[in-house]
Amino acid sequence: MSSLAEIASRPENLELLAEGKTKQIFDIKGEKDYVLIRSKDSLTAFNAVRKNELEGKSRIASKTTSNVFEYLQLLGLPTHFEKSISETEFVARKCTMIPIEWVARRVATGSFLKRNPGVKEGFRFNDLKLETFFKDDANDDPQWTDEQIVSNGLMIDHLKIGREEISLMKKMTKLVFRALEKGWALSNSALIDMKIEFGVTVEGEILLADVIDNDSWRVWPENDRRLQLDKQVYRDMKEVTEEGLALVLKNYTKVMDITATFSKHQQKCHVLVIMGSGSDGVFARKISDEAKKFGLETTLKVSSAHKTTSDTLEVIADFEESGVPTVVIAVAGRSNGLGPVIAGNSSLPVINCPPPSESTSLDIWSSLRMPNGIGCTTVLDPSEAALAAAKILASHNHIVFGKVLTAQLKNQINIYNANRKLE
């Protein structure tokens, strides 16, 4: 990527491919799979009926987009973003854009109220409200239903956009919104709605594409519309003034700074993998490795509830009093006293994950049949135990939350791809 960045940074290697209201897209000489996207200082509203040049916006918009895509890629979401190479430019995988704008709404406001009279502003969609709009400037981007998208038979780089593709993009749209919503919540700000777009690679892969910057959403600090930070401030101006543009630039800068925090862990989360014998180390490390994929810190310990009961409970006490959200995964076969003893003497969640053996069908009952008041669970597969721990801890850490959502999406993408191979 470093050589690609060097090539893309030279003007003689760039050829203008397309230009929109707020960005330019360039082909990169010798790099058929990549493009360079350059932000402009243009600020527009009402389909460019209102337009101003705002010095510094290009830098802020490009950095905000980079912040957002780097965060989403940290979560494991496939996107077209590759690398930021200057203050106003980034390199992306080349895609043919699907001419549909996907809008996700958590709160009813703006144009939604005009299209749906009777709905009060502030109505909350617990299940995100999704809308789609066909990108057609001449007709003010008309709203399309799923049926209209299917009926129009959109063919994007040999990929026909049908019900399965629409369903997949809906899932991706919801994931993007929910992940960014968690990021914004770190600064006590509410993500109200947002718009995104998708593209198709030459391999036929659907990717989150285009840009996601402060023109892409509504954000209300403290859930108060009067404090809004997004482009709506510009739209709401009866008359554009220098003071008004200065406020817009200030808000955009604040958004850039806040989105830079999205990729940072705000709350540590821990998984203690405790095994009854050192011979279970390989199995326990599988759990640890899987847990780390979700952004969880892990510790491996050997301790026997039968032979070193007090030592086991001392280890648990250390984690219980640390203040760090922790899940215990107990790895013990034969007569599993480890998980039940910990669960019966601690408030920490405990998951039994007994290693397989020839006598598993008999030994498993020591992990399943519990006296009253224990409250531990049992999972047989190490990767599933790690996933269960991640789900328990997801409410404490936005990155763990996002990685869990992305893992679920990848399962859905795998099923989608398997069906495509059958066609």
From Swiss-Prot:
The keyword Ligase applies. InterPro entries: PurE_classII (IPR033626), PurE_dom (IPR000031), SAICAR_synt/ADE2_N (IPR028923), SAICAR_synthetase (IPR050089), SAICAR_synthetase_CS (IPR018236). The keyword NADP does not apply. Residues 264-423 are annotated as: AIR carboxylase. Gene3D superfamilies: 3.40.50.1970, ATP-grasp fold, B domain (3.30.470.20), Phosphorylase Kinase, domain 1 (3.30.200.20). Residues 1-263 are annotated as: SAICAR synthetase. Pfam families: AIRC, SAICAR_synt. This is Probable multifunctional protein ADE2. The gene is paic-1.
